[in-house]
Amino acid sequence: MSLLPTATISDIARHNGRVVTLAGWVAHKTEKGKLVFIRLRDGSGVMQCVVFRKNVAEETFIAAQRLTLESSCRITGTVRADERAPGGFELDVNGIEIIQIAPEYPIQPKEHGVEFLMEHRHLWVRSSKQHALLRIRAEIIAAAQEWLNAQGFVRFDTPILTPCAAEGTTNLFATPYFDLGTAYLGQTGQLYVEAGMMSFGKVYCFGPTFRAEKSKTRRHLTEFWMIEPEVAFALHDDNLALQEQFVSAIVQRVLERRADDLATLERDTKPLERCVPPFPRITYDEALRLIAERYAEVEGCTPLEWGEDLGAPHETLIASMFDRPVFVERFPSAIKAFYMEPDPNRPEVALCADLLAPEGYGEIIGGSQRIHDAALLERRIREYGLNVDDYRWYIDLRRYGSVPHSGFGMGIERATAWIGGTHHIRETIPFPRMLYRMYP
């Protein structure tokens, strides 16, 4: 005996005219006299199933009447084309096997507050828009890894528990580590992936990262996922070219394969269709001039002094001036990470860039050319007030066959928010971790 279905809703078209068994959950039900209309979802799609009393056994009709929202069941019937039905097909039911009758479902088809939905996140992920957004997230992850693999990159897994900071010491999650002192949840895999780069040439890591930032903005999570490529011999401009090819390939893949999900989210795809290389590039200095001229156009945006970092309103303003993602490059070294290569023509700025998504979604990628000189790297570590001994292994990478190299990190959640067109990053990961949210 098996409970597995004989067909899935996503490929129901090839079963037209045949008897199939679907297995899933009741997304909606309507009773009209001798008819019961059941919208069944199976994870791959949603299909209307029609139970006509005179065509089925009495126990089947009673079973249809008993079904409640989110009840689980197996439904057998004949697939019939009907352009009025969702997906263009419906099921003429001849049998229902109830797996479980669900009690009253907490999330009813009415307006619920965000806090209520977040408390019931384990159930909210079943809703059509959350399902569509998480499908897009999965497609982005698959597209990113498959594109990198096709370009000759090797996945190189990095540790989550680390002995030191990689992106500054003010936002670390610390935990006791046996007799060895304190371990920290990794802020990035980048330092370790550089070791892999010296072995394989082109590598990437993919996994969760953790930032103990006390931020409540719609763009921040304390736990998020990053994909971080690193390339030997790549200079700053090579890095930017790789990023725009990478992002463009991901967007095109989502447009091609997840059109139905984008439609469910009511996403205007025209801005995504314009996401093709080359992306515009402006310097940090140029960004400051544009902000000074037009800051009044965005609420909360104010002019910046040289050496101040861009905030969310500044990123929104800059991105609004372009019709596709835009690079802001060559930030002051003092406001960036210690490992970034200084511009040889202007050492006070780093060979780095942030890629800003259009439509107010902010930074989706941060990257740089890395320092490849051991003495300079050690000096920068000291200047940042970090313990050099914690980074001996990292400095070692520059002592044995060092080469110029570059890399970047793309946050999966921010990319998903932008491509999916959702306002808040909390909906782009199954179970978001935020400053005041750790349940469920």
Swiss-Prot record:
Superkingdom of origin organism: Bacteria
Gene Ontology terms for molecular function: asparagine-tRNA ligase activity; ATP binding; nucleic acid binding
GO biological process terms held by the UniProt record: asparaginyl-tRNA aminoacylation
Localization per Swiss-Prot or TrEMBL: Cytoplasm
One Pfam short name: tRNA_anti-codon
InterPro entries named in the record: Aa-tRNA-synt_II (IPR004364), aa-tRNA-synth_II (IPR006195), aa-tRNA-synth_II/BPL/LPL (IPR045864), Asn-tRNA-ligase (IPR004522), Asp/Asn-tRNA-synth_IIb (IPR002312), NA-bd_OB-fold (IPR012340), NA-bd_OB_tRNA (IPR004365)
Enzyme class: ligase
Keyword Transmembrane attached: no
PROSITE patterns reported for this sequence: AA_TRNA_LIGASE_II
Oligomer and partners: Homodimer.
PANTHER family with a match to the protein in the record: ASPARAGINE--TRNA LIGASE, MITOCHONDRIAL-RELATED (PTHR22594:SF34), ASPARTYL/LYSYL-TRNA SYNTHETASE (PTHR22594)
Family: Belongs to the class-II aminoacyl-tRNA synthetase family.
Name this polypeptide is given: Asparagine--tRNA ligase
Organism: Roseiflexus castenholzii (strain DSM 13941 / HLO8)
Gene name for this UniProt entry: asnS
